[in-house]
Amino acid sequence: MTATPDAPAATSDAPFDLVVRGEQTLTTAGIVAREIGIRDGRIVAIEPLGSGLTGAEVIELADDQVMIPGLVDTHVHVNEPGRTEWEGFDSATRAAAAGGVTTLIDMPLNSIPPTGDVDALNAKRQAATGKLHIDVGFWGGAIPGNTADLRGLHDDGVFGFKCFLLHSGVDEFPHLDADEMEKDMAVLAGFDSMMIVHAEDSRAIDRAPSAEGNKYERFLKSRPRGAENVAIAEVIERARWTGVRAHILHLSSSDALPMLATAKRDGVRITVETCPHYLTLLAEEIPNGATAFKCCPPIREASNRELLWQGLLDGTIDCVVSDHSPSTAELKQLDVGDFQTAWGGVSSIQVAFTAVW
């Protein structure tokens, strides 16, 4: 039995508030048959199915239903305050709960103001008050001119700091160049915080072909793997020099996996995420004009997808997160289908887990 230290032990004369029984329960032992006892809102017992736990309420799961621990999604754009027409905390956390996510960490941009100082963090917390259906935490932003604000945000509870190495897509969250990123990394290393990086190189993107028009192949060429690879190499070396904890966001280019694996072996404190859309969708199958699929970095080819799966299985990629980034339908320009001007983002928190299950 697994029990919290202050929880009463399970006994036959002390039924649980809720017992859930299922043939498929995801545990550290794999998918096994278990029954779960819950008291005062906390799981206090995990026993083999048939152990006879009793409860005021009992839920028997169907054979094809799976009981899982609550998921943690560390890459979510909620957009409140400031852009609630895109989405807000009420809708985002309801969708998360429907998708099995019980904790999300909100990104520092797309809200107005972005989370670049303590006042902005407090504004976001105030906006979230009374609207949350799951647990929520916050990332801070690392942007030009806010180095002096990083320690205050850390002390006030942010989990780390996000920066971009190219235009973020919104003017109020400007990007850092590699030297500015390194300067902030050195500051963060002083209190063991983390720099999380949207790693696409601005110069490489500027030199790539335009994405204008409705051809997905053209959009793919506008965000080449090389732009990711160059930026990731910068993050690795700057993390190596400063000793900071660094994290690569939404890895799309499988070309970067060997250098990331080498950096990990070398002791660089770097972790990597990818997303369900990179693991399940294929560039070859995205119709021209289907801007619902536009995200940056982009969904790539079948050969790339298979290598991402290998990177996940061998531990080079540490986690899978949604990068949930909603907008209005008008911004996705579904009727126009222009990949240059459509908003780049996939709204997926409700379906992310089932997509890769």
Language-model region placement:
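Metal-associated gating/positioning segment near the N- to mid-region
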Residues: 65-127, 131
